[in-house]
A protein has these predicted regions:
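Conserved single-residue anchors adjacent to enzymatic active/cofactor-binding motifs
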Residues: 1-225
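Short, charged alpha-helical interaction segments and adjacent helix-coil junctions
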Residues: 2, 74-79, 180-311
């Protein structure tokens, strides 16, 4: 096990962002995420009965009421686990959070539909599908299609695809970039960077230090860690199956065309390229699971240097 916990296990995520003692971490992260937009002064964790009612939703959402230094209030939902139909689910969870605020007993009243804005922040610690997001940070707001002008601040989605964040430690300029670097690489770090530049990273180091966990905390963390690895393994298997099916269909089509056109060389190149891309996809998922460079190289069949280039 590494020196620091994996922040994307349910237990690790809750320890760093979902506890009263770690509120300063969450406030600092939100302020760096939304820098130059608003400044969170305080936050309150929402009542447990307001959290998702079904088993597959629990553990993936951290719900908080936030208040800015200008008196504005809004709700933040933070999600950190992949699920099927991920984007659709985030929309449903956000709409649920809005509907929970509507006073159903006063539906005819104008005040019944005055609700706090809901910001949904999603950590995607896996390679996004091509039909989801294509860059590290994707901000979605309600805006006019033609003018691009925002028409309401009531709903906002921020998707953070960590595998698409490529900055090295020395390339991180903003505090937000430093946060993302630390969270992405935390489990593999031997020391916490940026502690001399910002005090909050010293607090993060204290709470994330795996050697400070009690026996009970360690057992809970270890169980949560296995859940993450099982989920990642299932994702990798599903993607591998889909690729193999696609490659088989492509090879069959290529053979048919090759017989007709004599393109044996093209078929061979296609098979080689397909296998190479499959190995890279497997390596990316293994990296997202927190495995070491050597373990990923062994599991994917790629050279160590090529695995390093995928980080």
């Amino acid at each position: 096990m590494g020196k620091y916990i994996n922040p994307f296990t349910d237990w690790g995520f809750k320890r760093l962002f979902g506890q009263e003692f770690s509120k300063p971490l969450l406030i600092s992260f939100l302020n760096d995420l939304l820098v130059d937009e608003l400044h969170v002064k305080d936050l309150t964790f929402r009542d447990k009965e307001l959290l998702p009612p079904t088993k597959d939703q629990r553990g993936i959402i951290c719900d908080v009421y936030c208040e800015t230094d200008t008196g504005e209030r809004f709700i933040v939902e933070m999600q950190n686990r992949w699920q099927p139909n991920f984007l659709d689910r985030t929309i449903c969870y956000t709409c649920r959070s809005i509907l929970d605020q509507v006073d159903k007993g006063r539906a005819e009243s104008e005040d019944a539909y005055k609700f706090l804005p809901v910001y949904t922040i999603c950590f995607m610690n896996y390679m996004p599908r091509t039909d989801e997001v294509s860059k590290f940070r994707t901000d979605i707001v309600l805006a006019d299609k033609d003018t691009k002008m925002q028409v309401s601040n009531k709903i906002r989605f921020i998707y953070l695809a960590l595998p698409l964040f490529k900055n090295k430690a020395e390339e991180c300029v903003t505090d937000f970039e430093k946060w993302i670097y630390v969270l992405k690489h935390m489990e593999a770090l031997s020391r916490m960077p940026f502690t001399a530049q910002k005090e909050i990273f010293k607090q993060l180091e204290d709470y994330a230090d795996s050697h400070r966990l009690t026996k009970k905390e360690w057992e809970a963390y270890e169980n949560s860690l296995w859940v993450v690895r099982d989920n990642m393994a299932c994702m990798a298997a599903a993607e591998r199956e889909a690729r193999e099916k696609g490659h088989a269909e492509g090879r069959a089509e290529g053979r048919a065309e090759g017989r007709a056109e004599g393109r044996a060389e093209g078929r061979a190149e296609g098979r080689v390229e397909g296998r190479a891309e499959e190995k890279k996809a497997i390596a990316r998922n293994l990296l997202a699971m927190g495995l070491t460079i050597e373990q990923v190289a062994q599991g994917s069949g790629l050279p160590i240097e090529e695995v390093k280039s995928l980080q």
